[in-house]
Amino acid sequence: MSESQASAQENLYFDVVIVGAGSGGVAVSSSLLKRNGNLRIALVDPATKHYYQPGWTMVGGGVFSAKSTERKTHTLLDKRVSQIHQLVSKVEPDANSVSLQDGSVVSYDQLVMSPGLTLNWSAIEGLEETLGKNGVTSNYRYDLAPYTWELVQKTKHGKAIFTQPPMPIKCAGAPQKALYLSADHWLKNQCLDNIDIEFCNAGGVLFGVPAYVSGLQSYMDKYGVSLSYNHNLIKIDGETKKAWFNLTDAEGNKSEICKDFDMLHVCPVQQPPSFISESGLSDQAGWLSVDPFSLQHTQYENIWGLGDVMNTTNAKTMAAVRKQVPVVAKNIISARAGEAPSAKYDGYGSCPLTVERGKIILAEFCYGGRVAPSFPNWLNVGTKPTKLAWWLKSVALPFVYWNMMLKGRELMTNCPEEKA
């Protein structure tokens, strides 16, 4: 179809329907066509623009321009993929169909659910009204990451608060990445001593994989950061520059405290799209219920999960998606051939923690928090800050994303297969 687009004004049938044009959706469409070029594939998403979201941390740190993280969606899709510019209202798994918001229906043989998660900005009272002004920002939005960098450059003294909500969130390290790059700038511009930095984390640990905590803690100490655990942001008054937190003490008692700020970087509350549970596809928490290894739905054998929407315990990162894509693609090809899924995802995720401009602690791990480095120690020690990891984040990974991953060129993505 022209310009990789399709009209959904009538009932349509495809071999594979993919919900979501994010990293997973675009990449798996390409990977499937690499394996079977005759597949009829539809990608359901109204988005005309696609973003390299891992780059927004670098935008907020003054390393990337926002524009460099953006492409037009249709330019990334294989011409054999039909994009349907509609939102999903509900999946009818027993009918093998997807109902769209314009009332039309798309039928499928295999369905890939990769709609991502929902950023609930309204969950924090007063946040929406003050975002992008009054010193309140977030690297979790394309249009706000440049404001983060603007604030970092303008802030010479005062109070800077960085927040992290309850898990799960996209890239659990992102809230502290913003902190590190900001603090590094202030240190190098001789104003860090005049800025009181506080990291307010709704959780109880600095990072979920113990092997990396020591290295990260050393940077928190270097920058003089006050670590406030079990502090959950609930309300903001941008005009008076006050933020309220729910604090849970060691005995489980809750109290509310107010903090003044000059700069506030907020990580929003994150949740699954509502249509997942409304379609009967979710677990009790609302996330897509899948087998953690095959990524096949726990009830419907022709439905597959990919990316942030799943209830798997891996880190919700682009690196995880890069490893998940070939698993889903291989297993769909097997399913269409009447075979059981054999490709397995091991829970791999990666979080390049930008502890300073020019150095990164490259956290890589699988299910259970098992450290899973991609490189030998003589080349890169993942638990320590290295220049190589910075080069990967700032140069190599964006290139791999745009020119390989989204095009179905699978680099370092070998997935184990179950032996017969």
PLM features: residue spans?
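A conserved FAD-binding loop/helix module that cradles the flavin
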Residues: 306-355, 364
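FAD-binding core/adjacent interface of flavoenzyme oxidoreductases
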Residues: 2-14, 81-190, 251-254, 265
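A Rossmann-like FAD-binding core segment of flavoenzymes
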Residues: 38, 81-91, 95-98, 106, ...
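Beta1-alpha1 glycine-rich phosphate/pyrophosphate-binding loop at the start
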Residues: 2-82, 166-210, 415
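FAD-binding beta-loop-beta segment adjacent to the flavin cofactor pocket
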Residues: 286-304, 355-375
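C-terminal auxiliary extensions adjacent to catalytic cores
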Residues: 12, 362-420
